Amino acid sequence: MMDISELLDGLNDKQRERVAAPLGNHLVLAGAGSGKTRVLTHRIAWLIAVENISEGSIMAVTFTNKAAAEMRHRIQSTLAKHAQHQLFGMWIGTFHSIAHRLLRAHHLDVGLPQDFQILDSEDQLRLIKRLLKLHNFDEKAFPPKQACWYINNKKDEGLRPNDIEDFNDRQEREWIKIYQIYQDTCDRAGLVDFAELLIRVYELFEKKPLILQRYQQRFQHILVDEFQDTNKIQYKWIKILAGKTGQVMIVGDDDQSIYGWRGAQIENIQKFLKDFKAETIRLEQNYRSTANILNSANELIANNSDRLGKNLWTEGEKGDPVGIYSAFNELDEAKFVASQIQDWVEHGGKLDDCAVLYRSNSQSRVIEEALIRCQIPYRIYGGMRFFERQEIKDALAYLRLINNRQDDAAFERVINTPTRGIGDRTLDILRNLTRERQITLWQAVQVATQENMLAGRASTALLRFQELINSLQLDTAEMPLFAQTDFVIKHSGLYEMYQQEKGEKGEVRIENLEELVTATREFIKPDNAEEMTELTAFLTHASLEAGEEQASPHQSCVEMMTLHSAKGLEFPRVFMVGVEEGLFPSFRSFEEPGRLEEERRLAYVGITRAKKKLTISYAESRRLYAKEERHLPSRFIAELPRECIQEIRLRGTVTRAMNLAKVGSLSNTSAVENEWKMGQKVKHEKFGFGTVINVEGSENNTRLQIAFQAQGIKWLIAHLAKLEKVR
């Protein structure tokens, strides 16, 4: 038997308590940086080495294959002195990989062929496009990507077509029909998409009690990481597998539940406590961040309701205050970030210490350009650079073709974007013509139509496309570059196509197209481009930007990423940019308290990525879709503890004292003389709970600017508003 002390060495009291807990159901509420992975792996090692649980009785579920591989490695390292423990019988994997393993073993029981194929997301979209066309569905009314989202969403909820209520809604009936057609096709062809893996296993357990009983008897100990990210079918899956006798330990953090938009249900943690009568323990000691960073995160997240509650703390240093920088605009903000990174390196830091976090991908462009100007290498983590993104390349291809009809690459990119019913056979005819007659694709259209080489429908579609390009050029000839770009995006059909993409992905694409218009408005033609038109100069600029190589995986560089991508990572030096009302939190969240709370959790995740130094910035004005808009600092800044933050003022710049006063970090004469203070929590009988973010005037002329949790920002006259102070 293994020496118990070896399993508990290096753990704090709370971690030891959970690793060595009696058998049963447990919730480990693990704060950011609290060592949850270590607790999980040591718990599994404890079960094997101390409780003498067979490896084959344990199932450990993670959310990524990388996390599963790391968990297996850590457990094996912990048990290294015991050669007999090779974890051969233990199942460690993601929900999808474990479901796949079960379906392979029981393919006959679920009506699948032995060699069934997994459909990835691209294969699924391609199949749905074909089926919509085959069954004469209008792709404008039923966009293929929205059909993918609908089907996957229903499967994640555990619903088959005949389970869905149509509420006498004709459109819903059509969506159900598409789901049914798609599923029938997959079943006939032996195809299984990712969402199908989970629902099919759940149905296997429901319909085959003997198979369920076999796995319930085998997997007596189930451990699940990142439980706050589980969706409905995953929760049902764990519940049915555990049965009445299985013992389940889940590790999660309700304060880091940030994937509601893709089906994750934060309430699953609460349901687990109720359904499994689980004991809760909190891991609150943080091994990552300084006290100032942690106290800022704690104060921020305390504004959310229905939390299970925890308070992060550290035995480490207090650290620097959280820096708050008020930029004049997004260009000033980007320049500031680049200069701060240079300063960090000059004082002994490394580039790969630094991360720039933003709410939306569209925000990356101005930061990228500032880093390029300063010759600071960077990498877009988990994504592509701005000018490499699909929707940007689509829009630029239209502009390139308008600018130059000889551009065959641009022609091929947009000829069927949006779809025009021009098939591969038609394109092959055009390509052959370009080879045989040494002409461009644009010219090949003229030849093919004049010589009747094409079917009437294809010929009509190609001529209409040429008419579109010609009219776009004619209509925009006298427009400034930004207006031309805006017009082309709108009238080419790109904007409408991406608008129909359901969910966050479509919204991000639209934001990126809007940012492209902003980029054209800000573009200044260089002195060495006098002979070029403004459009040609911009297209050259975009090509050069896209051609800049990202830093190699082994090169020290700044990491840039969305806040969602940052989850699970940590960096000594973190910049959170664009922390403004309407951007972060987003305007969309103002109408839904639940969505606003998820935005706050996202801010909490961002703050807790920082180990040593955190800077939060906002721009007083920002160009969005080529329009300059005034912005207020985010309510999230107002919710930070004043003793933990500090305004950043740069030498030689105009003071921004009044800007930061809006978020309550500096005193304001009228506020001092007044009973109302920035940062004061209040309750209004109509608008609900909020935070005072600005105070103007005095006595009966006092006006308060309040960021309400559910109603957004409003100005109220203090003595008429009937506000209740909340402590």
UniProtKB/Swiss-Prot annotation:
Keyword Isomerase set for record: yes
InterPro entries in UniProt: DExx_box_DNA_helicase_dom_sf, DNA_helicase_ATP-dep_UvrD, DNA_helicase_UvrD-like_C, DNA_helicase_UvrD/REP, P-loop_NTPase, UvrD-like_ATP-bd
Positions that bind ATP: 33-38, 288
Catalytic EC class: isomerase
Keyword set includes DNA damage: yes
Alphabetized UniProt keyword annotations: ATP-binding, DNA damage, DNA repair, DNA replication, DNA-binding, Helicase, Hydrolase, Isomerase, Nucleotide-binding
One Gene Ontology term of the molecular function aspect: ATP hydrolysis activity
GO BP: DNA replication; recombinational repair
This protein's GO CC annotations: cytosol; DNA helicase complex
Family recorded in the similarity comment: Belongs to the helicase family. UvrD subfamily.
Protein name as catalogued: DNA helicase II
Species per Swiss-Prot/TrEMBL record: Haemophilus influenzae (strain ATCC 51907 / DSM 11121 / KW20 / Rd)
